Design a protein with these regions (language model features):
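Residue-level hotspots at or immediately adjacent to binding/recognition sites across diverse folds
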Residues: 1-207
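Conserved, function-critical positions that sit in or immediately flank catalytic
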Residues: 207-249
Length: 249
């Protein structure tokens, strides 16, 4: 049983490995085998930086932390450092189905297809951004094709490309700490639940946040698009991409 007295910042359960992995202060990593296990064992992480988040994908555990720390392990027991190409604190890491994405302070975003080589996405793409991330990331989520960032001050932002970020105002005074997509709710069995300070808890159903628009067509060509309701995805006045399917006979 662990006698660790420090802080854990993240913990995950990986069913295919039947393993718990917890990460925390000063490079602390503890693992346990079995979903009901109460015996956690310390592992050498190869870093003294605080570890803030851990994810499992591509048959690997990957953890990130302060000072740009990135470490990886295929079993949770033996960890090796990776080069993140940043010195900013990394506060969260996700896998969006195609690549690892880590986010942190000063709008830092890093991407990797294999967890070994990390591309400093935010710095490299900055010149192409109309609304770059200028906030400190606390968390990053990927839900229904949308990247959702939560800042360290509890504000909500969204992006389709990790380059341009827009603020999403919510009608709640307390800061948001985290959110999760669930498989229940009135709209196609989906509901996003957010939690935050002061026992904050609220939810959104995708149908409420769906953008609607009216297109003008001349001689079979779309000449303009008017946003009627920006929903979650667009600000009124922005120019969203339009995909037109061929006519069906």
């Amino acid at each position: 049983v662990s006698e660790y007295a420090g802080n854990f910042n993240d913990v995950i359960w990986e069913g295919t490995r039947d393993t718990w992995v917890a990460v925390g202060a000063a490079g602390s990593i503890f693992t346990a085998v079995g979903v009901k296990s109460d015996a956690y064992f310390s592992r050498f992480s190869n870093t003294v930086q605080d570890l803030n988040s851990v994810v499992y994908a591509q048959n690997e555990f990957v953890a990130v932390g302060n000072g740009g720390a990135v470490i990886a392990s295929n079993d949770g027991n033996i960890w090796s450092p990776k080069q993140s190409n940043t010195n900013y604190n990394l506060n969260d890491i996700i896998y969006d189905g195609n690549r690892f994405i880590t986010v942190g302070d000063n709008g830092t975003i890093g991407v990797s297809s294999d967890k070994n080589y990390w591309q400093p996405w935010s710095q490299q793409q900055y010149n192409n951004a109309v609304h770059p991330a200028t906030f400190d990331f606390r968390n990053l989520k990927y839900i229904d094709g949308i990247y959702i960032g939560i800042s360290t001050t509890g504000n909500l932002y969204y992006s389709f490309d990790l380059i341009n970020w827009n603020s999403r105002v919510v009608s709640h005074p307390n800061s948001i700490k985290d959110l999760v997509a669930t498989n229940f709710g009135p709209s196609q069995g989906r509901r996003v639940i957010a939690v935050g300070s002061g026992t904050t808890a609220f939810y959104a159903d995708p149908v409420i946040n769906r953008a609607t628009a009216t297109a003008s067509v001349t001689a079979g060509v779309i000449t303009s698009v008017t946003i009627n309701d920006g929903g979650f995805g667009y600000d009124v006045g922005s120019s969203p991409p339009v995909i037109v399917a061929p006519d069906k006979t």
